[in-house]
């Protein structure tokens, strides 16, 4: 009995630790998001005034210092979100107009 209880406690502590680690990672990622957003905007407005969207996408092709890497991950993630939304709107009988726009 004592052994199983010990195993359960160990398991629980591991799970809790894991959860905390994940939470912290997500928290820092979100914190990074905002600072990354601002620095990205500042940086892109320095280089190119008009197209900072293009500049952001070319970012990871040129040079990717670790702090920039997070920015590219962020843009990729937002692209995924848009992709999901796009798929949602192309559901049969939903709105064919949007579907055509996305395909072209």
Curated annotation (Swiss-Prot):
Residues 37-104 are annotated as: Disordered. The mature small signaling peptide is generated by proteolytic processing of the longer precursor. Keywords: Apoplast, Developmental protein, Hormone, Hydroxylation, Secreted, Signal. Residues 28-85, 101-104 form a propeptide. GO terms for molecular function: hormone activity. Transmembrane segments: none annotated. The keyword Cell wall biogenesis/degradation does not apply. It comes from the Eukaryota. Belongs to the C-terminally encoded plant signaling peptide (CEP) family. Extracellular signaling peptide that may regulate primary root growth rate and systemic nitrogen (N)-demand signaling. Mediates up-regulation of genes involved in N uptake and assimilation pathways. Interacts with CEP receptors (e.g. CEPR1 and CEPR2). This is Precursor of CEP11. It comes from Arabidopsis thaliana.
């Amino acid at each position: 009995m004592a052994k199983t209880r010990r195993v359960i406690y160990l398991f629980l502590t591991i799970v809790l630790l894991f959860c905390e680690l994940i939470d912290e990672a997500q928290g820092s990622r979100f914190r990074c998001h905002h600072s990354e957003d601002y620095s990205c905007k500042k940086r892109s407005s320095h280089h190119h005034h008009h197209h900072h969207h293009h500049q952001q996408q070319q970012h990871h092709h040129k040079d990717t210092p670790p702090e920039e890497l997070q920015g590219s991950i962020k843009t990729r993630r937002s692209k995924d979100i848009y992709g999901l939304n796009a798929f949602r709107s192309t559901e049969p009988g939903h709105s064919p107009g949007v579907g055509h726009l996305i395909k072209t």
